[in-house]
């Protein structure tokens, strides 16, 4: 079964293949299913970019998208995630995309369902498609990863983006720096070195900023937004000390004037909206992989063909 739960489960050659496939879609390659195939997006947390990006990718591939709203589903009556996914499998859905607030929600499904599951974010755990689109954006800029310095700045402890990216970037040969408030350090993450924010920004080829994950905090932040920006944000002054050719990334949503000065969101060095564009192509590649795995596993052999 061709699930995608975490990039840490994929060998580097498969990650490179996904990036190559995404680049091919970006260059205009068109794929279509030879017969109807169905996918459901189960988002148990709010989302704009990931949800809409998956839906765009699904439609570009000619997949049929089954509407699903947790607030108007039997989840509200106590139905479990497992029973929800098994129901969708039973009625003919070929793959599911899931975002869930629970870390590693997918472990209960890994060997229990017969359709591919794509993780669109699990609590503070993993966000594999975000990492893939970040990797694609970095590769487009620098051509390779070996020797690059990537500074991940902000709410490290509560960020699935930080966790996913630090692991895969380290495997790819990049040097990862972390920076942010001491109380938001992630001591369980073995990848990356903690430095002060000014040092991180000055050394980085890639400055990756993170949103404060207020919804995952047990306590309120002890700083005002203005204080956080001054101490840990990418201010205009700090941006002037970035290396020549360095780029700015952010998984979004962006809190302007908090983790990044508003003027920098669309500055020359920013690739924030390029990340969003790349997200569609990356998710097309991931969905294609999932559907091919579905065909090999079950009832739909020889389902895809290339449209030249």
Swiss-Prot record:
Superkingdom as given in the UniProt entry: Bacteria
Binding site for L-aspartate: 77, 160, 211
UniProt EC number: 2.1.3.2
GO biological process: 'de novo' pyrimidine nucleobase biosynthetic process; 'de novo' UMP biosynthetic process; amino acid metabolic process
Key words of the record: Pyrimidine biosynthesis, Transferase
Keyword Ribonucleoprotein: no
GO cellular component: cytosol
UniProt GO MF annotations: amino acid binding; aspartate carbamoyltransferase activity
Swiss-Prot/TrEMBL catalytic activity: carbamoyl phosphate + L-aspartate = N-carbamoyl-L-aspartate + phosphate + H(+)
Pathway membership: Pyrimidine metabolism; UMP biosynthesis via de novo pathway; (S)-dihydroorotate from bicarbonate: step 2/3
Enzyme class: transferase
Binding-site positions, carbamoyl phosphate: 49-50, 99, 127, 130, 252-253
Family assignment from sequence similarity: Belongs to the aspartate/ornithine carbamoyltransferase superfamily. ATCase family.
Function: Catalyzes the condensation of carbamoyl phosphate and aspartate to form carbamoyl aspartate and inorganic phosphate, the committed step in the de novo pyrimidine nucleotide biosynthesis pathway.
HAMAP family hit by this protein: Asp_carb_tr
Cited PANTHER family: ASPARTATE CARBAMOYLTRANSFERASE, ORNITHINE CARBAMOYLTRANSFERASE, MITOCHONDRIAL
Assembly information from the UniProt record: Heterododecamer (2C3:3R2) of six catalytic PyrB chains organized as two trimers (C3), and six regulatory PyrI chains organized as three dimers (R2).
Descriptive protein name: Aspartate carbamoyltransferase catalytic subunit
Source organism of this protein record: Geobacillus kaustophilus (strain HTA426)
Lineage, uppermost ranks: Bacteria, Bacillati, Bacillota, Bacilli, Bacillales
């Amino acid at each position: 079964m061709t699930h995608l739960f975490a990039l840490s489960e994929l060998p580097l050659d498969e990650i490179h293949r996904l990036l190559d496939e995404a680049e091919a879609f970006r260059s205009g390659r068109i794929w279509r299913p030879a017969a109807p195939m169905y996918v459901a997006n189960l988002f148990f947390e709010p989302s704009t970019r990931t949800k809409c990006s998956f839906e765009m990718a699904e439609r570009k591939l000619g997949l049929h998208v089954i509407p699903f709203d947790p607030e108007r589903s039997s989840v509200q009556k106590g139905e479990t995630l497992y029973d929800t996914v098994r129901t969708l499998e039973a009625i003919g859905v070929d793959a599911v995309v899931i975002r869930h607030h629970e870390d590693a929600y997918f472990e209960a499904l890994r060997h229990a369902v017969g359709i591919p599951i794509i993780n669109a974010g699990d609590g503070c755990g993993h966000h594999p498609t975000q990492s893939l689109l970040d990797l694609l954006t970095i590769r487009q800029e620098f051509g390779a990863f070996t020797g690059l310095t990537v500074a991940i700045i902000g709410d490290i402890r509560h960020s699935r983006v930080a966790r996913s990216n630090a692991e895969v970037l380290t495997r790819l040969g990049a040097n990862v720096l972390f920076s942010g408030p001491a109380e938001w350090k992630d001591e369980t993450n073995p990848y990356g070195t903690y430095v002060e924010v000014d040092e991180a920004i000055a050394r980085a080829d890639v400055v990756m900023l993170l949103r404060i994950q207020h919804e995952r905090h047990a306590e309120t932040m002890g700083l005002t937004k203005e204080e956080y920006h001054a101490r840990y944000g990418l201010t205009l002054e700090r941006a002037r000390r970035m290396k020549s050719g360095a780029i700015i990334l952010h998984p979004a949503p962006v809190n302007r004037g908090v983790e990044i000065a508003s003027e920098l969101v669309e500055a020359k060095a920013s690739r924030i909206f390029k990340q969003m564009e790349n997200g569609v192509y990356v998710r097309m590649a991931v969905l294609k992989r999932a559907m091919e795995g579905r065909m090999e596993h079950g009832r739909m052999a020889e389902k895809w063909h290339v449209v030249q």
